[in-house]
Amino acid sequence: MKILLRNLVNLFARNKTAALLNIAGLTVAFASFMLIMMQVWYELGYDRCYPNANRIYGLCFQVPQSGDLGTVLPRPLAEKLLRSSAGIETGGCLSYQHGDPNVPFFRPERGPESAIAAGFSLVSRSWLDVFGFETLSGDLNAFSEPNAAIIPHSLAVKLFGSENPVGQTIAKSEGYREAAQFTIVAVYRDFPKNASLKNDVYTDLKERLLQDFNNCSTPYFVRVKQNADIRRIEQDLLPLVWNYAKTYDEDSTRSQRLRLVGLNDLYFF
């Protein structure tokens, strides 16, 4: 070992420039490798943060001609689909039509000038069960109460500091379609950055869009039972899909397909 070290020192002394370039090159290569692997790990871990993430699937229409996936469904059709296979444990939806990614929320007693921007989403109550929202305080069972809302821990800290936000009221700027004030019934743990779910203020979608077969603005996700046969579930749902498609295009009825796509697969699709 001593001889090896002495030879390396002598080599470095005789070829300082070449040795420094080699060391610099190896350093850059190693740093690049680490950055690439960190990004790969980040991407492969996308949407793996939810409890039972391997059992969560998106309900997607597959376009016959191109094979592309449509990730939104009419709510009345999707609700029927949820009840049409024994392999589905639960399912829920989010409304693109009613949400807003940038809403100013504030405490009424402090006024709009203290507002903090946050996302605002309307979801079905079962959406919380599908993705396993982790409650830090409060009770998710109160989610369906009138004008109830749940907020992420990060927003709770910004708005309330060390105070307990449960039972407190938050308001959003006037002019929005929904109620201007909400009562916080629970605080949930923030989702990581490599998650499709955003750290929004969530309220109950309730009965909205339940009778509108022409409105495709609700992505649906289901949690299937342990060891469920995904292809069997798709076959269970297909007759309803064909019946729905028949009302729009009699000739293409049998070409319609509904696929259950896993969360991580949906991200890379």
Task: Spell out what each predicted region is.
Residues 4-13:
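A short amphipathic helical element positioned immediately N-terminal to and/or at the very start
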Residues 10-11, 19, 267-269:
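Membrane-interface anchoring determinants
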Residues 15-44, 54:
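Short, strongly hydrophobic transmembrane alpha-helices
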Residues 17, 86-90, 164:
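Glycine-centered tight turns that cap/initiate beta-strands
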Residues 36-104, 114, 209-210, 215-223, ...:
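Membrane-proximal extracellular/periplasmic loop immediately following the first transmembrane helix
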Residues 63-65, 105-110, 172-176:
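Short acidic, glycine-rich loop/turn motifs
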Residues 121-137, 147-269:
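Mid-to-C-terminal secondary-structure elements
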Residues 140-144:
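Short, glycine-/polar-rich solvent-exposed loops and beta-turns at beta-strand/coil boundaries
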